[in-house]
C-alpha cells in the first residue's frame, strides 16, 4: 500500500462511513440510548450504566509516549490503529480518546484525530466544532464569570475581594493578547473594574470537572465545590455559596454524554472531553472510559504527551477518581523523537543516524522506569514513519530486547489495524500472563510537598522540588483550608523531563521549581505550575489555519 503522497484529510475523505446506528449495533446499544447528531455522530445516554451495571468491565489499555517533538509522535494514530488491530484479531474493542481543541488545531497541530489509515471519522467535524461540547464548557465557564461580576455589582453580599477573584474567563483558541485584561471599564453601569484574564478552555477547571465526574449528581457536587474567589477575611467563596451549581449543571448536561463515532475501519470510538496534559490532567472523560469498559473486552485510551505528563496524571488522578486499574500500558517511541533527544537538530531528523537514536534512547528508558514504578505490564510500540530506516528501527528493538523490555514495531498509519496486530496479540498475552501490581505513586495522606517531590523524583528523575515564596504562601492556604489530601496536577513543559524545554534526553542534577499552586477543588486536585508554562498559548508565526479552507464543492482542505 503506497500512501505517502496522500494527506490524512485525503485519506479521510476517501473513506466510506457507515451510519452511526450500525456502529451502535456492534455495541448492542438500544435505540433509546442513542442521540444522533446527523449521519455519523451520536451521543450515548448515561442511562446505559443502569442497564449494564452487572456487566463485567473490559481491560483498559493506556497509550502514552516518550517526550515528543512539536509535531507529535503519532500517539493518537497508534491508539486508533491498536483499537482496529484488536478487531482484526477477533477481539471486541473500543477506542476512548479526547476531543481536539481548536487552539492547537488552528495553531501547530492542524488536527488530532489520528492519521493515515488509523483515524477517527468524520475527521473534519471532530477537529472543528464536533457536537459542541467545548462550546458548552466555554459557555458554562464564562457564565460563571458573569455571575461573579454581577454578584459584586449588585451589592456583593458574600463580601468577595475583587483583588482575589481566581476564576478567569476562557476561550478555545490560542490568543496571547487575552492572557491579561481589564474588565468593567466604562463607568459604574459596566460593573466593577478589575484585572482579569483568559485561559484556553482545555485548561479550565470546568473541563477537568466534566472529565472526572461520574454522573450528573457528581457533576453538580463538583461544580458546587469550585472556589472562584476569596472574601475580605481570606475565606474561600464557592459556586455553592453563590448558588449557581444548578444552572451550570443544566448547561453541561448534554456535554457530559460521551460522543460515539467510528474509525476508518468501522471500529467504535468514544471521543469525549479534552483537557491539555501539560497544563491540565490530559485524559478523556472518565464517563467515556467507564462506559467503554462496559461495552467491550478491550478499551484503548490515550493520555496527552509523554508518560511524565498525561500517563502520570491518568494513573495518579483519573484511576483514583474512577477506582479502576489499567490492564497494560503502551509506550510509543519514534525514531525522529529519539534522534532529537540524541542531539540532532529538528531540521535534520529525516536523515539516517542510528547513533543519535541510541544516544536519545535514554529518554525512552526513563519513561519505561516511570511505568514500572506504577507496577503495570507495558510494551514499547515503535511507530514507523516513512523516513525511518530499517537500521534505525532495528536499533530500538535490539536495545529493548537487550534490556528485557517487550517491543513491537507498528505501521498503523499506512496499514491501519493490520499494521498493529502483532502489538495487539502481544498485549493480550501481557494482560493474561504478566503480573499487574498497580499502585499509586503517592497516598492521599502524603503532604502536598511530599506528593510534588515523589512525582519530581520518580517520574522526572529530578533531585527534588523548590517552591517559590508565592507557592509557599499558597501551600499554607491550601493546608489551612484542608485541601492537602488532594492529588497534584503538574503543569510542565511536554518537551523535557525537566521544567526547561531545552533540557532534552534524560537530564540529571536538576530540580523542579514550583512557581504557583492553584487549588482546583471541584476537579479534585491541586495544580502546580512549573517553569514558564502558560495556561493560554499563543499562535506560531504561520498558524496551521493559513492552509485551511472550504472549497466550492463543500470539501475541507488543510486539516492534517
From Swiss-Prot:
It catalyses: (6S)-5,6,7,8-tetrahydrofolate + formate + ATP = (6R)-10-formyltetrahydrofolate + ADP + phosphate. Pfam families: FTHFS. InterPro entries: Formate_THF_ligase (IPR000559), Formate_THF_ligase_CS (IPR020628), P-loop_NTPase (IPR027417). Its EC number is 6.3.4.3. The keyword DNA repair does not apply. GO terms for molecular function: ATP binding; formate-tetrahydrofolate ligase activity. It is an enzyme of class 6 (ligase). Keywords: ATP-binding, Ligase, Nucleotide-binding, One-carbon metabolism. It comes from the Bacteria. One of its GO terms (biological process) is tetrahydrofolate interconversion. Pathway: One-carbon metabolism; tetrahydrofolate interconversion. Belongs to the formate--tetrahydrofolate ligase family. This is Formate--tetrahydrofolate ligase. It comes from Bacillus pumilus (strain SAFR-032).
Amino acid at each position: 500500500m503506497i500512501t505517502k503522497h496522500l494527506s490524512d484529510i485525503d485519506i479521510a475523505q476517501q473513506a466510506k462511513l457507515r451510519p452511526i446506528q450500525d456502529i451502535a449495533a456492534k455495541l448492542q446499544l438500544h435505540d433509546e440510548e442513542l442521540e444522533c447528531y446527523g449521519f455519523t455522530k451520536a451521543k450515548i445516554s448515561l442511562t446505559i450504566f443502569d442497564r449494564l451495571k452487572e456487566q463485567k468491565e473490559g481491560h483498559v489499555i493506556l497509550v502514552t509516549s516518550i517526550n515528543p517533538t512539536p509535531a507529535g509522535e503519532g500517539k493518537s494514530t497508534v491508539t486508533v490503529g491498536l483499537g482496529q488491530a484488536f478487531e482484526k484479531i477477533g477481539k471486541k474493542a473500543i477506542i476512548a480518546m479526547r476531543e481536539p481543541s481548536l487552539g492547537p488545531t488552528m495553531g501547530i497541530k492542524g488536527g488530532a484525530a489520528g492519521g493515515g489509515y488509523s483515524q477517527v471519522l468524520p475527521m473534519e467535524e471532530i477537529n472543528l466544532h464536533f457536537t459542541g461540547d467545548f462550546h458548552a464548557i466555554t459557555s458554562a465557564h464564562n457564565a460563571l464569570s458573569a455571575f461573579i461580576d454581577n454578584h459584586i455589582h449588585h451589592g456583593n453580599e458574600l463580601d468577595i475581594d475583587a483583588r482575589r477573584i481566581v476564576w478567569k474567563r476562557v476561550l478555545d483558541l490560542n490568543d496571547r493578547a487575552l492572557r491579561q485584561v481589564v474588565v468593567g471599564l466604562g463607568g459604574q453601569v459596566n460593573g466593577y473594574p478589575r484585572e482579569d484574564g483568559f485561559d484556553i478552555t482545555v485548561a479550565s477547571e470546568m473541563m477537568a470537572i466534566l472529565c472526572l465526574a461520574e454522573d450528573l449528581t457528581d457533576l453538580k457536587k463538583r461544580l458546587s465545590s469550585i472556589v472562584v474567589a476569596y472574601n475580605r477575611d481570606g475565606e474561600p467563596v464557592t459556586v455553592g455559596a453563590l448558588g449557581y451549581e444548578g444552572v451550570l449543571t443544566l448547561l453541561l448536561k448534554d456535554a457530559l454524554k460521551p460522543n460515539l463515532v467510528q474509525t476508518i475501519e468501522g471500529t467504535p470510538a468514544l471521543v469525549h472531553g479534552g483537557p491539555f496534559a501539560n497544563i491540565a490532567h490530559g485524559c478523556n472523560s472518565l464517563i467515556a472510559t467507564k462506559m467503554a469498559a462496559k461495552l467491550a473486552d478491550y478499551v484503548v485510551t490515550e493520555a496527552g504527551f509523554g508518560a511524565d505528563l498525561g500517563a502520570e496524571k491518568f494513573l495518579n488522578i483519573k484511576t483514583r477518581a474512577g477506582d479502576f486499574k489499567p490492564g497494560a500500558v503502551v509506550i510509543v517511541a519514534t525514531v525522529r523523537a529519539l534522534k532529537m533527544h540524541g542531539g540532532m537538530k529538528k531540521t535534520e531528523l529525516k536523515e539516517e543516524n542510528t547513533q543519535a537514536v541510541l544516544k536519545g534512547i535514554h529518554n525512552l528508558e526513563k519513561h519505561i522506569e516511570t511505568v514500572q514504578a506504577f507496577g503495570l505490564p507495558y510494551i514499547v510500540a515503535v511507530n514507523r514513519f516513512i523516513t525511518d530506516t530499517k537500521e534505525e528501527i532495528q536499533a530500538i528493538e535490539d536495545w529493548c530486547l537487550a534490556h528485557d523490555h517487550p517491543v513491537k514495531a507498528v505501521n498503523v498509519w499506512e496499514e491501519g489495524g493490520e499494521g498493529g496486530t502483532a502489538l495487539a496479540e502481544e498485549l493480550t498475552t501481557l494482560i493474561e500472563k504478566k503480573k499487574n501490581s498497580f499502585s499509586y505513586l503517592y497516598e492521599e495522606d502524603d503532604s502536598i510537598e511530599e506528593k510534588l517531590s515523589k512525582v519530581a523524583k520518580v517520574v522526572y528523575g529530578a533531585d527534588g522540588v523548590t517552591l517559590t515564596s508565592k507557592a509557599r504562601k499558597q501551600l499554607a492556604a491550601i493546608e489551612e483550608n484542608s485541601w492537602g489530601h488532594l492529588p497534584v496536577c503538574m503543569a510542565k513543559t511536554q518537551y523535557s523531563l525537566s521544567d526547561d524545554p531545552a533540557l532534552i534526553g534524560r537530564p540529571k542534577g536538576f530540580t523542579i521549581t514550583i512557581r504557583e499552586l492553584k487549588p482546583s477543588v471541584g476537579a479534585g486536585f491541586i495544580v502546580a505550575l512549573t517553569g514558564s508554562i502558560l495556561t493560554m498559548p499563543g499562535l506560531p508565526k504561520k498558524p496551521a489555519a493559513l492552509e485551511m479552507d472550504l472549497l466550492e464543492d463543500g470539501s475541507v482542505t488543510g486539516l492534517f
